[in-house]
Amino acid sequence: SYVEINNFYTMTVYEKGSEVVRMYQTLFGRDGFRKGMDLYFKRHDGHAVTCDDFRHAMADANGRDLAQFERWYSQAGTPRVSVRTAYDAAARRYTVTLAQGYGDASPAARETQQGPLLIPFAIGLIGRDGRDLPLRLDGEAAAAGTTRVLDFTDTEQTFTFVDVPEQPLPSLLRNFSSPVIVEYDYSDDDLAFLLAHDSDP
């Protein structure tokens, strides 16, 4: 039973809830999100529903298993994503390693943690001339755009971009693609360069 109904109506609940819903659009794009909404209303219009009902509609409309995504609703605390990068000039490969955790989470928050989250992590790579570089992940036939949403699902995961012509500067968590705290060792010069050139507002 619920002890205090006010727990459901705090600013944290509203703000986190809206960010979780926005992540569906980040994962599936506007068209995929619209398909999920259409299916949700077709199934549940006029009914009392749950967050699981909404998640199932998004999953079914887009043909994707979102069981891991449920942890956003049940795990307390703000995730931290630490980022490490390395560039191999000879191979023209740029690796990005992401690690997720909760840092100094309270004991109560740690008790709710069931495993890694599905984190949509948007990234771009900026060349020395300040322009976005085309992005192609290892195994892909061709580059696809200049911003890529990485499906970050493990405690630690490495993504490799290929055909990267120069040492880039990463533009991380573009469009605030998920409500996480990013940890990356930017220098002051790096931050000034991003301020001057990053296409992500």
Please provide the spans of the model-predicted regions.
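Acidic/His/Gly-enriched intrinsically disordered linker/tail segments
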Residues: 1-19, 23
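Acidic, glycine-rich low-complexity/disordered segments
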Residues: 25-27
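Surface-exposed patches in mature extracellular/periplasmic domains of secreted proteins
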Residues: 35-36
